[in-house]
Amino acid sequence: MKQLLQDSWWNQLKEEFEKPYYQELREMLKREYAEQTIYPDSRDIFNALHYTSYDDVKVVILGQDPYHGPGQAQGLSFSVKPGVKQPPSLKNIFLELQQDIGCSIPNHGSLVSWAKQGVLLLNTVLTVRRGQANSHKGKGWERLTDRIIDVLSERERPVIFILWGRHAQMKKERIDTSKHFIIESTHPSPFSARNGFFGSRPFSRANAYLEKMGEAPIDWCIKDL
């Protein structure tokens, strides 16, 4: 485990990895990866924590579970590997980004450049069976990702939580709003984007909070590959 995580996350979470629920989750994953097609690749499960250290987190964008189509998931919420078609929700995120800040829409869907700047792209469930959304829901991941939200909420340095849709907004109760900022709207899915996501300007609002705190803003524009 330790080699998959930044030291700062290991220090925050190492006790969690010793708990019985996590040991059970690990055993379940060993079976699932041996017998089923599971996404993302096992080496990519903790990419959100790998790319964005605990100390560097400025913004959190919460997702649900990984994309369940071949080659899509890369361990970062909403992000897909380069060369993979942009899923509908991600297309809508890029449309809002264009309207909000004026960024051109990139020719790929990888959000690694955000992660490297301090945007924690965290799904609440970190694995999924091919073609079966929510197939690893309720298996233990939520306890771990709740703990990740908790340790960020306990931090003195403010974090901006971007919560899109009801599933993400259920985590609001874990966030200390006397220290941290919440930006919320409907989900960018085609089913709900026109009911409040479009026009919500999450990217410029996040940068306004960062500048108010004396932090460098995020360069949300993603370069073509």
Curated annotation (Swiss-Prot):
Keyword Cytoplasm: yes
Single GO BP term: base-excision repair, AP site formation via deaminated base removal
Catalytic class of the enzyme: hydrolase
Cellular-component GO terms for this entry: cytoplasm
Subcellular location: Cytoplasm
Catalytic machinery residues: D65 (proton acceptor)
Keywords, sorted A to Z: Cytoplasm, DNA damage, DNA repair, Hydrolase
Enzyme Commission code: 3.2.2.27
InterPro entries to which the protein is assigned, alphabetical: UDG_fam1 (IPR002043), Ura-DNA_Glyclase_AS (IPR018085), Uracil-DNA_glycosylase-like (IPR005122), Uracil-DNA_glycosylase-like_sf (IPR036895)
Cystine crosslinks: none
Known catalytic reactions: Hydrolyzes single-stranded DNA or mismatched double-stranded DNA and polynucleotides, releasing free uracil
Segments passing through the bilayer: none
PANTHER family noted in UniProt: URACIL-DNA GLYCOSYLASE (PTHR11264:SF0)
NCBIfam families in alphabetical order: PRK05254.1-1 (NF003588), PRK05254.1-2 (NF003589), PRK05254.1-4 (NF003591), PRK05254.1-5 (NF003592), ung (TIGR00628)
Subunit structure: Interacts with bacillus phage phi29 protein p56; this interaction inhibits the uracil-DNA glycosylase. Interacts with SSB (ssbA).
Biological role stated in the UniProt entry: Excises uracil residues from the DNA which can arise as a result of misincorporation of dUMP residues by DNA polymerase or due to deamination of cytosine.
Protein name: Uracil-DNA glycosylase
Native organism: Bacillus subtilis (strain 168)
Gene that this polypeptide is encoded by: ung
